[in-house]
Amino acid sequence: MVQISEVKGSSRENRTAAHTHIKGLGLRPDGTAEPSADGFVGQAAAREACGVVVDLIKAKKMAGRAIMLAGGPGTGKTALALAVSQELGTKVPFCPIVGSEIYSAEVKKTEALMENFRRAIGLRVRETKEVYEGEVTELTPEEAENPLGGYGRTISHLIIGLKSAKGTKKLRLDPSIYEAIQKERVTVGDVIYIEANTGACKRVGRSDAYATEFDLEAEEYVPVPKGEVHKKKEIVQDVTLHDLDMANARPQGGQDVMSMMGQLMKPKKTEITDKLRQEINKVVNRYIDQGVAELVPGVLFIDEVHMLDIECFTYLNRALESSISPIVILASNRGHTVIRGTDDITAAHGIPPDLLARLLIIPTHPYTPDEIKTIIRLRAKTEGLNITDPALDKVADHGSKVSLRYALQLLTPASILARVNGRPGGIEEADIAECEDLFLDAKRSAAIVSQDSEKFLS
């Protein structure tokens, strides 16, 4: 029997998350907010404030400052932070965490907080590399008498001829490069490049002038490099300070039995010492002074910040005042509440007053019924769902009376019911009503619990 199997495509499935539709802050060139743009609806004042923050971050004038997004649940705080990250682009580090993430049995909470601080600070290292690139026209090792005596001969240097589109060059190379060339199995007619600083040699492929040759091995034919043989290339690398910390905190061990056994055992999370971080900061500052690297302060976004305790807030105060610190964006949906880690100290948003005094607070306000309707229409389009106008009005009504999250969560089950009921036009009002009966919202569930309290365990 002939075996036939389907080949799965390599393209990823399109998944939609809660904030997939957010593409940016949706601001005009003068910094004012569009009513609806880049997937963002409403919250004009908050978006304009975030736009100013983005401009300050890009100008590198915002480092070491903290911003707070304060508002009720479902008012777009996380969406604002995500829009800020979209506006900044991929080159600026953006590290989102939740307040409860920093509690661990292995690492103390202040260490976890500092780790995320360092993740949000980038270092852009610019390195100029001198490269010799071309097609090999000559490869002659020159021998000399062995300095150790005897009849053997050693390679004193290597003569190599390289040809590019603009000319040829003959190079005299160190014998150590000859070993690298032998490893790469370079022969006359191959295209190679050699780094002048490190002596690293890489075989790119066979010159396409030899493409007509018949060979048993499948060769990759490449064109002769353009420009001169000797080139200067600027290479830009983006790393975070946390990457540097980890590289130095966990150096690769030797080849003895004990280090091999240590690598096989369950890796324990390494706690990076303050001394090591100070040493790395010294090296980073030296690079910045030399002009080799530049610091890119990123954004640390802490959602549900009221979950941090009093020790974390005290540490946050000190960390914000350090010379190398990112922009910190906090978000909380609490009003007056007890600060975690204390018995009876209440404060606005669950944050101590001394830290609150250092924050620039951006308020978010509940959405209007029209804005809720626009958001639901936008989400339905993002998820590829068709919805009729009466059904949209009903869902929007739930969004304003119950909650926006509940209204958005009704869309996908309603689309499945519409498909089962054979409605080609999309989601109708009856599907929303059926979903409403199947899935309770928080208020109705709480009402049932209070009515039938004796049937539940207390």
Curated annotation (Swiss-Prot):
<dbReference type="InterPro" id="IPR010339">
    <property type="entry name" value="TIP49_P-loop"/>
</dbReference>
<dbReference type="Pfam" id="PF17856">
    <property type="entry name" value="TIP49_C"/>
</dbReference>
<dbReference type="GO" id="GO:0006281">
    <property type="term" value="P:DNA repair"/>
</dbReference>
<dbReference type="GO" id="GO:0097255">
    <property type="term" value="C:R2TP complex"/>
</dbReference>
<dbReference type="GO" id="GO:0005524">
    <property type="term" value="F:ATP binding"/>
</dbReference>
<keyword id="KW-0547">Nucleotide-binding</keyword>
<dbReference type="InterPro" id="IPR003593">
    <property type="entry name" value="AAA+_ATPase"/>
</dbReference>
<dbReference type="InterPro" id="IPR042487">
    <property type="entry name" value="RuvBL1/2_DNA/RNA_bd_dom"/>
</dbReference>
<dbReference type="GO" id="GO:0035267">
    <property type="term" value="C:NuA4 histone acetyltransferase complex"/>
</dbReference>
<dbReference type="InterPro" id="IPR027417">
    <property type="entry name" value="P-loop_NTPase"/>
</dbReference>
<dbReference type="GO" id="GO:0003678">
    <property type="term" value="F:DNA helicase activity"/>
</dbReference>
<keyword id="KW-0804">Transcription</keyword>
<keyword id="KW-0067">ATP-binding</keyword>
<dbReference type="Pfam" id="PF06068">
    <property type="entry name" value="TIP49"/>
</dbReference>
<feature type="region of interest" description="Disordered">
    <location>
        <begin position="1"/>
        <end position="31"/>
    </location>
</feature>
<dbReference type="GO" id="GO:0016887">
    <property type="term" value="F:ATP hydrolysis activity"/>
</dbReference>
<protein>
    <recommendedName>
        <fullName>RuvB-like helicase 1</fullName>
        <ecNumber>3.6.4.12</ecNumber>
    </recommendedName>
</protein>
<keyword id="KW-0010">Activator</keyword>
<comment type="function">
    <text>DNA helicase which participates in several chromatin remodeling complexes, including the SWR1 and the INO80 complexes. The SWR1 complex mediates the ATP-dependent exchange of histone H2A for the H2A variant HZT1 leading to transcriptional regulation of selected genes by chromatin remodeling. The INO80 complex remodels chromatin by shifting nucleosomes and is involved in DNA repair. Also involved in pre-rRNA processing.</text>
</comment>
<keyword id="KW-0234">DNA repair</keyword>
<dbReference type="InterPro" id="IPR041048">
    <property type="entry name" value="RuvB-like_C"/>
</dbReference>
<dbReference type="GO" id="GO:0031011">
    <property type="term" value="C:Ino80 complex"/>
</dbReference>
<dbReference type="GO" id="GO:0043138">
    <property type="term" value="F:3'-5' DNA helicase activity"/>
</dbReference>
<keyword id="KW-0156">Chromatin regulator</keyword>
<dbReference type="InterPro" id="IPR027238">
    <property type="entry name" value="RuvB-like"/>
</dbReference>
<keyword id="KW-0347">Helicase</keyword>
<comment type="similarity">
    <text>Belongs to the RuvB family.</text>
</comment>
<keyword id="KW-0378">Hydrolase</keyword>
<dbReference type="GO" id="GO:0006338">
    <property type="term" value="P:chromatin remodeling"/>
</dbReference>
<keyword id="KW-0805">Transcription regulation</keyword>
<dbReference type="GO" id="GO:0006357">
    <property type="term" value="P:regulation of transcription by RNA polymerase II"/>
</dbReference>
<keyword id="KW-0539">Nucleus</keyword>
<feature type="binding site">
    <location>
        <begin position="71"/>
        <end position="78"/>
    </location>
    <ligand>
        <name>ATP</name>
    </ligand>
</feature>
<comment type="subunit">
    <text>May form heterododecamers with RVB2. Component of the SWR1 chromatin remodeling complex, the INO80 chromatin remodeling complex, and of the R2TP complex.</text>
</comment>
<dbReference type="GO" id="GO:0000492">
    <property type="term" value="P:box C/D snoRNP assembly"/>
</dbReference>
<keyword id="KW-0227">DNA damage</keyword>
<dbReference type="GO" id="GO:0000812">
    <property type="term" value="C:Swr1 complex"/>
</dbReference>
<dbReference type="GO" id="GO:0043139">
    <property type="term" value="F:5'-3' DNA helicase activity"/>
</dbReference>
